[in-house]
């Protein structure tokens, strides 16, 4: 995954300083053996429970704000029946950054924690973590902690990203050099920003997807989500109000798509279905090659969610499925290949 990311360096923009990129990153499974050691470093004995990890950006030079952020995280995790192992300073090498990337670089830390309920597993655990994260984000926003950002908070996956060039990712994040840092999948992205200015927060992948393209219907989609929020209801969450607003403040079109995709996943829609709801396939009732079941499915989905239209190639995961797909007009490049040893690659280029 890291080598593949380095190979698409040409897909991204580079600042005049020659080292600052629009953003690059990688989304992988939490490497369990790697983080067991990190838990034990905190002075705790690993008890075979699911290790949950949060990858967090804090304001680098505002120490009071850092403490406020950490206090909110600790408080809400504890309130929601999680136990905190401790905080971990993520080892980084700022020397590989360009001047602009270094000037805006956040403090990068991880929080290691577990659920106090051993029966809370998989989707149920992820749902609880998601709701807790939304509470944390909303509280931080209410007190104007603007440089606080959670890249990932999960028992399943973790995201390493920033405003460096793709080839510098493992030189910047030293964790990625560790032999125990393994995963069954990797979603990687090299950004060329179009609608929004580059920032550490808007580097991709996001929590559920990586997106190449633009959402031309974004303003309408955002307004429709505000309408849908009024009708949102589910027994799966403690309080549905904790999840609002679904689209976070300051989100780019790609980040907003990720917000909605993630909510659908966490609410029980598998990644392939969430993709069809948001970025539907091209279809017509006149298409005789399409089965009646598929026509009925697409017709139903069309009545439940407005399409997020525009040039788009996405890769995403709900921690069970890993998907890659095009928009219905095929306006962004996406190719796939299966190797002789059964590795599936999908990306903007082949070879």
What kind of feature is each model-predicted range?
Residues 1-351:
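Conserved short alpha-helical segments that host acidic/polar catalytic motifs at enzyme active sites
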């Amino acid at each position: 995954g890291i080598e593949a990311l380095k190979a698409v360096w040409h897909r991204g923009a580079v600042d005049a300083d020659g080292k600052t990129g629009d953003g690059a990153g990688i989304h992988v499974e939490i490497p369990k053996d790697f983080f067991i050691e990190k838990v034990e470093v905190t002075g705790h004995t690993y008890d075979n429970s699911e290790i949950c990890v949060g990858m967090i950006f804090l304001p680098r030079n505002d120490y009071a704000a850092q403490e406020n952020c950490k206090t909110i995280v600790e408080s809400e995790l504890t309130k929601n029946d999680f136990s905190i192992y401790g905080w971990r300073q993520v080892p980084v090498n700022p020397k590989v950054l360009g001047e602009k990337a270094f000037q805006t670089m956040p403090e990068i830390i991880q929080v290691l924690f577990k659920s106090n309920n051993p029966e809370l597993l998989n989707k149920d655990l992820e749902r609880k973590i998601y709701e807790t994260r939304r509470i944390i984000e909303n509280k931080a926003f209410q007190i104007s902690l603007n440089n606080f950002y959670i890249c990932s908070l999960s028992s399943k996956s973790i995201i390493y990203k920033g405003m460096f060039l793709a080839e510098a990712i493992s030189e910047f994040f030293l964790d990625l050099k560790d032999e125990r840092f393994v995963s069954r999948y990797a979603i990687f992205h090299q950004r060329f920003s179009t609608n929004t200015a580059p920032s550490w927060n808007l580097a991709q992948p996001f929590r559920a997807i990586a997106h190449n393209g633009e959402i031309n219907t974004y303003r309408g989609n955002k307004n429709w989500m505000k309408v849908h929020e009024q009708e949102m209801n589910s027994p799966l969450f403690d309080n549905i109000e904790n999840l609002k607003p679904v689209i976070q403040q300051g989100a780019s079109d790609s980040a907003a798509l990720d917000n909605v995709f993630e909510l659908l996943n966490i609410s029980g829609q598998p990644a392939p279905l969430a993709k069809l709801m948001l970025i539907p396939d091209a279809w017509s009732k006149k298409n005789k090659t399409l089965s009646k079941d598929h026509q009925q499915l697409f017709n139903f989905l069309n009545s439940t969610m407005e399409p997020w239209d525009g040039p788009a190639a996405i890769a995403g995961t709900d921690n069970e499925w890993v998907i890659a797909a095009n928009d219905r007009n095929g306006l962004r490049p996406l190719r796939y290949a299966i190797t002789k040893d059964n590795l599936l690659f999908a990306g903007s280029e082949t070879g």
